[in-house]
């Protein structure tokens, strides 16, 4: 037991959840430790490839190094929806993310960079998706993310047009504007 004159200040500490993260409130920023993401989205083709949109699903698992910086590894599946391009790929990537505020609503920057493996001969090549967005904390452990970015997807494409002057394989950027919605945990 302490004597009252020895006590300078009485404070209440935040309780710990099972993962070792402190709960700072009902819906606050992320804490240091394991963190995972699952995103669904669509990329709208641009330029020469404006009709080559694709459905996407990605997930990333890693470590929140400090409250504002995350690093992880991820995998996804992309499927092109154009009638002339029936193929998909599986990107494997490193994921780097910065959350700017320690609050329940925070802007973020995200960079996914890696290589996509084609589900057939088309669709394999360098993959990069920088994006900006907003995270809405739902609880101390979960958040909803909305992001907008530009996706670079280098692909080896086979040209077989009878009316064109080129036949064979060519590497093209099937890049586009990506819109993603997902959750983190």
Task: Give the ranges of each region predicted by the language model.
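Compositionally biased alpha-helical segments
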Residues: 1-37, 41-47, 51
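Short edge beta-strand segments in beta-sheet-rich domains
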Residues: 2, 91, 172-176
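A short local loop/turn or secondary-structure capping micro-motif enriched for an aromatic residue
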Residues: 9-10, 80-81, 153-154
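Intrinsically disordered, low-complexity segments enriched in small/polar residues
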Residues: 18, 23, 31-34, 39, ...
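Short, flexible, glycine/charge-rich loop motifs used to bind or transfer phosphoryl groups or to couple energy/partner
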Residues: 27, 60, 168
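Gram-negative (and chloroplast) outer-membrane scaffold detector with strong preference
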Residues: 32-46, 51, 55-144, 182
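Predominantly the C-terminal beta-signal and adjacent terminal strand-loop region
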Residues: 106, 125-185
